[in-house]
């Protein structure tokens, strides 16, 4: 055998022995409200190749809100739940659920608001007297905010679970529910045409402005088995959020994914969802959340420092 043929054969053998890239690890993600900006983070990061850069592939399930997200995480159907309500998560852990918080999802809640059809006489949430007020699912951040409005404003109201935003729009416009909930950019088009009117934001409640209201969750067994994978996920997640606020490709991709109108999306970015609201590192306002959890009977007593340390395990550098 000639030297050239020998070297060629050796090159082929070596190339077969050296891996050309590890197979991506698949994570199952529960994301709320398909089409929302926050809920689109996994999908847009996947499209942009950011998660693949961290050897991750995402299998994304869309839920109708934080309550449903909590359920699918605890059932083991998914690895990570995005945007679960803080109080629902505290309550589940307090009742013995092997739950872990691995990052914040939303802080300040400027993007969540309540609205009425144009024909409604209501101009403000403080005027509510016996009307029905929508929230997504039990234990979700929208549910807790409705309870806060009722408590702080002394309202007589009927909280009603209406599911996701499209379902809520149908129920409000058909007269089944008096006051709808939404998260920007949904319903902003109805506000701009005068078909609907905003009567409150979650951030109208002072304590919520500095409070983390939604978190990312996993099960204790999943965190133990996939700690490194979840840490990589959180890094890729944050890199995706940075990309969404800096890349000229982000908004066009989001428009294609969500089917929403560009003016509403641009308004959302200007006035409703600043980059800092999507930080993941700190669970802010935890003391206030604990008080709320006890007041609204998600917890019978506050969690101890030892319990909080076990519950909240945000990966370093995420």
Language model regions located:
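Bacterial N-terminal signal peptides that target proteins for export
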Residues: 1-9
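Soluble non-cytosolic domains of exported or imported proteins
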Residues: 36, 64-67, 136, 140-141, ...
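Conserved C-terminal helix/tail region of periplasmic/extracytoplasmic solute-binding proteins
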Residues: 293-318
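Pocket-lining segment of extracytoplasmic ligand-binding domains
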Residues: 87, 166-256
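Signal peptide processing junction and immediate N-terminal pro/mature segment
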Residues: 21-23
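Bacterial N-terminal signal peptides
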Residues: 8-19
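Secondary-structure end/capping motifs
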Residues: 224-300
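Short, glycine-/small- and polar/acidic-enriched structural segments
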Residues: 25-155, 159-162, 171-174, 178-184, ...
């Amino acid at each position: 055998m000639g030297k050239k043929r020998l070297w060629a054969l050796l090159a082929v053998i070596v190339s077969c022995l050296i891996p050309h890239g590890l197979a991506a690890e698949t994570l199952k993600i529960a994301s709320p409200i398909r089409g929302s900006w926050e809920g689109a983070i996994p999908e847009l990061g996947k499209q942009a190749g950011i998660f693949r850069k961290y050897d991750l592939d995402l299998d994304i399930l869309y839920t109708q809100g934080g309550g449903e997200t909590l359920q699918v995480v605890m059932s083991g159907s998914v690895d990570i739940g995005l945007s679960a309500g803080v109080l629902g998560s505290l309550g589940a852990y307090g009742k013995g659920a092997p739950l872990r918080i691995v990052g914040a999802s939303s802080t300040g809640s400027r993007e969540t608001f309540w609205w009425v059809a144009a024909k409604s006489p209501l101009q403000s949430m403080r005027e509510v007297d016996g009307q029905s007020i929508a929230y997504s699912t039990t234990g979700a951040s929208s549910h807790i905010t409705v309870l806060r409005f009722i408590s702080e404003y002394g309202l007589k109201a009927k909280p009603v679970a209406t599911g996701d935003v499209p379902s809520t729009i149908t129920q409000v416009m058909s007269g089944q529910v008096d006051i709808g909930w939404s998260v920007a950019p949904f319903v902003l088009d109805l506000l701009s045409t005068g078909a609907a009117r905003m009567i409150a934001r979650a951030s109208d409640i002072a304590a919520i402005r500095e409070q983390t209201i939604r978190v990312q969750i996993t099960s204790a067994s999943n965190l133990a088995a996939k700690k490194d994978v979840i840490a990589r996920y959180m890094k890729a997640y944050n890199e995706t959020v940075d990309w969404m606020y800096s890349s000229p490709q982000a908004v066009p991709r989001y428009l294609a994914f969500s089917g929403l109108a560009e003016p509403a999306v641009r308004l959302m970015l200007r006035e409703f969802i600043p980059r800092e609201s999507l930080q993941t590192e700190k669970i802010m306002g935890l003391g206030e959340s604990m008080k709320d959890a006890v007041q609204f009977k998600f917890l019978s007593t506050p969690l101890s420092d030892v319990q909080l340390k076990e519950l909240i395990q945000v990966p370093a550098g995420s």
